[in-house]
Amino acid sequence: MSKRAAEETVEFNSKNGPGQRGTVADNVDTEMGEFEDAYEDEIESEEEYIEADGEKDNGMDEEEQNDAQPSKIPWLPGGKINADEKLVADPSVYEMLHNIQVKWPFLSFDILQDSLGEERRAWPHQMYLVGGSQALDSNDNELTVMKLSQLYKTQHDENDDASDNSDVEEDPILEHKSISTKGACNRVRSARRPANSSKESLLASFHETGKVHIWDIAPHLRSLDSPGVMVSRKENSPLYTVNRHKTEGYALDWSPFEYSLLSGDNANEIFLTKYSNGGWQTDSSPFLSHTAAVEDLQWSPSEKNVFSSCSCDGTFRIWDVRNKQKTSALTVNAHPGVDVNVLSWNTRVPNLLATGADNGVWSVWDLRSLKSSSSVATPVASFKWHRAPIYSIEWHPNEDSVIGVVGADNQISLWDLSVELDEEEQDSRAAEGLQDVPPQLMFIHMGQQEIKEMHWHRQIPGTIVSTAMTGINVFKTITF
């Protein structure tokens, strides 16, 4: 696996799909950034338009000029842009859109569970994130715990009460606490608190050094919420370090039922770390069936002892941790001859699992129809919309048919697999030139460069956070 080169470039290496770090220009601002105006950059969406520029002075009066505004047509990724045309974002399709610039780009991040309530819909919003950096110097890397507050609605229409925001400062606030780490962070995942747990906020990070660290970030969150509360040096140290991996990796996931952590590496191995009897312990032997690097893994949302994994060997596998041989129970040749970069288990319909591959194809599988023997299976749905590798995929936590997909083509596509068109609707789409657009494709978010990961916020319905080489976006579309 190639490493980052300390040179002036912002390009990510493409090998191993989503698990590749990028290099950062050495002239970037090394201070933690701020929120930027949501519409300062041309952040593109499904409702992107091409606008033809007109002449500055054409002899028409104001009324005639209003009647002769530049024509606007929907633009789709891959479409042609002429020299006299420009892309103009349509802010009306976002209820909220904020852009955050950070000190170092995050290859991976996670949204932290909080105690502010479920199904939050009232503005402004507040959330907590954690991101792992990829700095120019290996010794400059850090985990950043962030508090984002005053996330106001950025879409205003005639129905909004003018008095609601007239006296309110709408600039979002970003506060953060950092933990120094050695080596770039390949993956970071926060644990969701199991029932009756006394532990508050556990975090795991997988680094280019091959080390997996487990952290307690409760002190950092308390410090963010209570100005003046300090974080000690001891609290900036990991609770436990997994030393079993021979090389770095990108696969990491916490069990939703208990404090059990799975980590998969580029040596094809998966290790299980558990908390029991007051301490952490990692199994001495790995789960071993994959024949190439393990790219992603996830615990079953419904079965305590079951997890899935995907690999550069073109397969995804289902495992049972009780199997003493530590081999997979089911092998599916999901994308033969192609790296399977990511997977996501549907938390509301546990028999559905989605995978994303290096050729831009993503598929949905019904586990009930798969046989125990290794064979080429048929997905219940498969799409080739993205023009580059799939880097992230995640089911909506509240809508069982909705899924978000990130591609290396700088798109985040949002889909509703329940959508079906009748013949009349199909004819109408064809007349609009949309016959090549899958009807299940509901929204396209663009504007970031080198997007690597996205997550739905479990407690703020429809809200998405994404990380890229150019920073972090926090947004909510009018679609979901």
From Swiss-Prot:
Superkingdom field: Eukaryota
Subunit structure, as described in the record: Associates with ribosomal protein L3.
A GO cellular component entry from the record: cytosol
UniProt-listed Gene3D superfamilies: YVTN repeat-like/Quinoprotein amine dehydrogenase (2.130.10.10)
Keywords recorded for this protein, A-Z: Cytoplasm, Nucleus, Phosphoprotein, Repeat, Ribosome biogenesis, rRNA processing, WD repeat
The protein, known as: Ribosome assembly protein rrb1
Segments annotated as WD repeats: 183-225, 289-329, 334-375, 385-425, 446-480
Modified residues (Phosphoserine): 163, 166
Keyword Cytoplasm: yes
Function: Involved in regulation of L3 expression and stability and plays a role in early 60S ribosomal subunit assembly. May be required for proper assembly of pre-ribosomal particles during early ribosome biogenesis, presumably by targeting L3 onto the 35S precursor rRNA.
Acidic residues composition bias: residue spans: 28-52, 158-172
InterPro entries: Glutamate-rich_WD_repeat, Histone-bd_RBBP4-like_N, WD40/YVTN_repeat-like_dom_sf, WD40_repeat_dom_sf, WD40_rpt
Residue numbers spanned by region Disordered: 1-78, 155-176
Protein's GO biological process: cytosolic large ribosomal subunit assembly; ribosome biogenesis; rRNA processing
One MF term in the entry's GO annotations: protein carrier chaperone
Gene source species: Schizosaccharomyces pombe (strain 972 / ATCC 24843) (Fission yeast)
PROSITE patterns: WD_REPEATS_1, WD_REPEATS_2, WD_REPEATS_REGION
Protein location: Cytoplasm; Nucleus, Nucleolus
